[in-house]
């Protein structure tokens, strides 16, 4: 199967996986949001002012979950993301979920983004088990913090065998909760400017130039890189063990995703709630964050102060 077919197949799979897995939409996180933006550019939410007037306290952040994010509109998800900092670059295994916010039209145009600019492709829905491909890149990630590298956790190699080849079993394998998982689609980790909110950095997950990483395989790893989907992710920490991410394909925003590590959450959340402080690996910008006590509930807010 040629590369163009696989790129389009992945795009179709992403849309199909979400549509087949639809469930009742939950309510959005019960936290403060700015009013909905108007149609004019001048009516858009000022993210710096929003954070100054309605900072998210640790208590607010504890109310956000991977599930209730799916009940928020894209504008609400953006407002949450803009009030977060990068936090520490993660380390270890994280479970991932991609999601399309309430009222979003991303499902309909995702395959269009993936297929844009690819000439001569033939849409072949029977080319692979599309439902398995849909969440490959955002299903789960393994962070090698000290190396500045990330690899994606694949739990079913069957759909990839036609392009990986007969030596598929040589791909590095690890055990996750008693299940076999394979590591593919490497990416480089670093701090960089957010494409949504340039006031501070995010943790960047970059698939563009990864052919020099140990274990790189031209197929299928090239599909996520500069000659394929040109995927670039960015993440910020909601609270310990929980990150909110934005995925871009071909420089166009494509979808949101969440990453969660239960062990880290259980271990570090109590101290976070009590102190409101975290370690920051990335630049937090001129609108710096500090821990301050809330008079009402003695909660500590990650408040912003303009220098």
Predicted regions and their residues:
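C-terminal motif of bacterial Sec signal peptides marking the signal peptidase cleavage site
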Residues: 20-21
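Soluble ligand-binding/transfer domains with enclosed cavities or grooves
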Residues: 27-305
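Bacterial N-terminal signal peptides that target proteins for export
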Residues: 1-10
